[in-house]
Swiss-Prot record:
It is found in: Cytoplasm. Its EC number is 6.3.2.8. The lineage of its organism: Bacteria, Bacillati, Bacillota, Bacilli, Bacillales. Pathway: Cell wall biogenesis; peptidoglycan biosynthesis. This is UDP-N-acetylmuramate--L-alanine ligase. One of its GO terms (cellular component) is cytoplasm. GO terms for biological process: cell division; cell wall organization; peptidoglycan biosynthetic process; regulation of cell shape. It comes from the Bacteria. It catalyses: UDP-N-acetyl-alpha-D-muramate + L-alanine + ATP = UDP-N-acetyl-alpha-D-muramoyl-L-alanine + ADP + phosphate + H(+). ATP binds at G108, A109, H110, G111, K112, T113, S114. InterPro entries: Mur-like_cat_sf, Mur_ligase_C, Mur_ligase_C_dom_sf, Mur_ligase_cen, Mur_ligase_N, MurCDEF_pg_biosynth, UDP-N-AcMur_Ala_ligase_MurC.
Length: 436
């Protein structure tokens, strides 16, 4: 019996892939740091063993899948090579796996995870679909027709894939620790486009995506009249969004989604276009769009007394704009309070003015200290450099969250890609203790 051993199983992509293989009746285990990470809940539900790193975890007869964060000098990878066991890097293994299905890669600087989750949910309503989402969610179906997965542009990892279809949500400059500028990012997406086998669904409102060249048809979607799939007559309501879809200027149908903000309409439009191209029944699409409950760490909302708390992964100015816009649509009468933890010194420094501009759209801003990534843990920049660019912004720590209580009817948006949830948890605990 083959055992799939994951080196770094708590990584978001690795966790998802482990779940998929387990659901397909393979034996799966993995190792990682002992610190708890949100992805391990799904692994524990499936009784997938999570071991501390140790070279003795590696045994003959296993298939070793290694996370991208772990170098060839890692003790388990060294042990595998000593035993002549092939080591598969995560993105290469995934690239091979998807070839068994009609595969759809979802990529873009922003909106990947939400769009992947929405597409997987909609496709499941019509056909057996396996999926891998970048929030640590994976699901495998043995007789799948489709394989839907999130494909990340960082370090050009998505070039390991040759999908049947690609949805491209946007091109924007991010990951300044790797990409040099927007042209460098575009070149990565252009190279990816040439590897797609059947068709590309791209946002035509994005100036960079308009320049994409491909060997397959490129279907454009968006709000602009030049798009193949266009959203019109948009009704932004507190219970979701309704819009008409026109295909090449001919009315197609009316759709309702549970999401808020223009970005949610665009994500849905991409899914509608892909489903139209694959002849998925439109009634199934309409139904599934109304039952989508979202993905982890993307506008996850919960009431707490008179306040509303939202947890969101937004860590780029474009994403912060979208999250605040969505909150205002759903809660037009409430005060919007942003609690933001910048992620990486390089990104914060590169987009300092843009962060200030986007955060200023909230009614009040609280800033947590900068979260350094594993690749960098110090920088000359400080959180005060951002604070002084935002009128009235205050600094906050996980021991001073009680200041948030004064926003009696507020929507508190905890945003960031680091450990911002630590601050949210501290505040929830503070409120619960005060209520006793």
């Amino acid at each position: 019996m083959t055992v799939y051993h994951f080196v770094g199983i708590k990584g978001t992509g690795m966790s998802s892939l482990a779940q998929i293989l387990h659901d397909m009746k393979h034996t799966v285990q993995g190792s990682d740091y002992e610190k708890r990470f949100f992805t391990q809940t799904a692994l524990e539900k499936r009784n997938i063993s999570i071991l501390p790193f140790d070279k003795s975890n590696v045994k003959e007869g296993q298939v070793i899948i290694a996370g991208n964060a772990f170098p060839d000098t890692h003790e388990e990878i060294v042990a595998a090579k000593e035993l002549n066991i092939p080591v598969h890097r995560y993105h290469h293994f995934l690239g091979d796996l998807m070839n068994q299905y009609t595969s759809v890669a979802v990529t873009g600087a922003h909106g990947k995870t939400s769009t992947t989750g929405l597409l997987a949910h909609v496709m499941q309503g019509a056909h057996p679909t396996s999926y891998l989402i970048g929030d640590g969610t994976g699901h495998g179906v043995e007789n799948s027709k489709y394989f839907v997965f999130e494909a990340c542009e960082y370090r050009r990892h998505f070039l390991s894939y040759n999908p049947d279809y690609a949805i491209m949500t946007n091109i924007d400059f991010d990951h300044p620790d790797y990409f040099t500028d927007i042209n460098d990012v575009f070149s990565a997406f252009q190279e990816m486009a040439l590897q797609v086998k059947k068709g590309i669904i791209a946002c035509g409102d994005d100036e960079e995506l308009q320049k994409i060249q491909a060997k397959v048809p490129v279907i454009f979607y968006g709000f602009g009249e030049d798009n193949d799939f266009q959203a019109r007559n948009i009704q932004k309501r507190t219970d979701g969004t309704i819009f008409d879809v026109f295909v090449r200027n001919t009315y197609y149908d009316t759709f309702k989604i549970t999401g808020y903000g223009n970005h949610s309409v665009l994500n849905a439009l991409a899914v509608i276009a892909l489903c139209h191209y694959e002849n998925v029944d439109v009634e199934a699409v309409k139904h599934q769009l109304t039952t989508f409950e979202g993905v982890k760490r993307r506008f996850n909302e919960k009431p707490m007394g008179e306040q509303v708390i939202i947890d969101d992964y937004a860590h780029h100015p474009t994403e912060i704009n979208a999250t605040i816009e969505a909150a205002r649509q759903k809660h037009p009468e409430r005060e919007i309070v942003a609690v933001f933890q910048p992620h990486t010194f390089s990104r914060t420094e590169k987009f300092l003015d843009e962060f200030a501009e986007s955060l200023s759209k909230a009614d009040q801003v609280y800033l947590c200290d900068i979260f350094g990534s594993a690749r960098e843990n110090k920088g000359e920049l400080t959180i005060e450099d951002l604070q002084k660019r935002i009128d009235g912004a205050e600094l906050i720590t996980d021991t001073t969250t009680d200041v948030l209580k004064k926003h009696k009817n507020g929507v508190l948006i905890f945003m960031g890609a680091g450990d911002i949830q630590k601050f949210e948890a501290a505040y929830v605990k503070e409120v619960q203790v005060a209520e006793k």
